[in-house]
Every structure is written in C-alpha cells, then in structure tokens.
Amino acid sequence: MLESAPFARLPTPMNVEQARFNMVEQQIRTWEVLDQDVLDLLYVVRREEFVPAEYRAFAFSDLEIPLYDGADEGERMMQPKVEARILQELAVKKNEHVLEVGTGSGYLAALLAARSHHVYSVEINPKLKAFGEENLRRGGVENATVQLGDAAQGWRTFAPYDVIVLTGSTPILPQTLISQLKVGGRLFAVVGDPPVMEARLITSVDEGSCYTTDLFETCLAPLKNALQPARFEF
C-alpha cells in the first residue's frame, strides 16, 4: 500500500529527469519496449503531471498508483511499462481515431493523442472524468475529447475506430467492441479473471473477421459493467 503525505514531494528538477530516465531505461526498455518513438514520447509527456498530488513522489515507480485519495472504486494508473507496451503494440498513426475506454488520469490519452489524429476517451466515474479532463487541459492536449458514459461494451457515437484501448480488464471481450473497429483496426484488451489475465491485440482483417495475438500476462482491475460470461443453472 502506498503512503501519500509526507512523502509526496517530488525530487529536485534534476532528480526528476534522472528518475524519468531510470523509468525508461530500467523498467520500460527492459520490458521489450524498443520502439524509439515510444521511448522518446515518454520524455515529452510528463507523467508526474497526471499523478494525484499526494502520490507524485511515485510517478516513475514500477507500480499502480491510486488515482485519487480515498478512492473506493479501486481505480489506478497502470504501471509505466504496461502503458508503453500498449503504445508500441498498437502502433498508432497520425491519421487514426482512437477510442479509449476508461480515461483515468488522462495520461494514456495524452500519449495516444500525441500519436493519433484524435482520441475519444469515455469515463464512467464523474470524479475521474473531471480529473482526467483537467489534466489533459493543463497538459495542452487539444485532440482528445473526454465524455462521461459507459463504454465497456462499445461507444457508437464516433464509431468506427482505427484503434480501441480498454484500460481495465474484461472477463470476455464483447463482440460489440470488435464490431466497432475499422478494417485494419486494432484493439488492446486485458482479458480474463484474476489471477490469470492475458493482454491481447485483436486486429480486424475484414468485416466480421479478426485475429488475436497474445502479448503478455498481467492483471488489471475490471472495467465497471464489463461483460460477464453466461452462467448456467442446473
């Protein structure tokens, strides 16, 4: 469990940059993130500015960070290495439109926005929607739209999308989400139940057809209202 105050103060500016360098070189690069464009972006988008004030001393740590003090929903920022792998595996292009399911702090949305034409981020928690939106505004991110709603099984408003990212896990992947991908589109999701979950990349080949690549094992808190498997009664 993280302690916040009195250990929340960031180091001096020089040490902040050293901590960022260590995060990239020791955590992220060693986790098979070798795309130099992704690594460079992690120096540009300042992670510490998206972390709640009481946890900023942990901004570059290899752990999940609570998104606001006293959170009763369990929302957390992903580990930096997971965020970086997501960026690398999705290989987002500048002309692409992205759906992010779960805004959280807004940090991943900012990273995605730097590589895409526009990010549509949907957050079910009003407090986190406001938190993430304000972080994006302060960060000068103009090509990300944050909306309040439930996108765990899709978001038709701006569909279809080139890229879809789920920032929480889902026991099974809804077909409605896959159907909102453009041909050639990619979807990142962590699928399964604890303690065994698999990060997967789903690529749309043509209408109604896709293939799945298993990327790595991890464990994320589930999305609210994530699709559950059918339960049979005897």
Which sequence ranges carry the predicted segments?
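Conserved nucleotide-cofactor-binding alpha/beta core module
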Residues: 87, 91-211
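Class I SAM-dependent transferase core
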Residues: 2-99, 107-110, 115, 128-142, ...
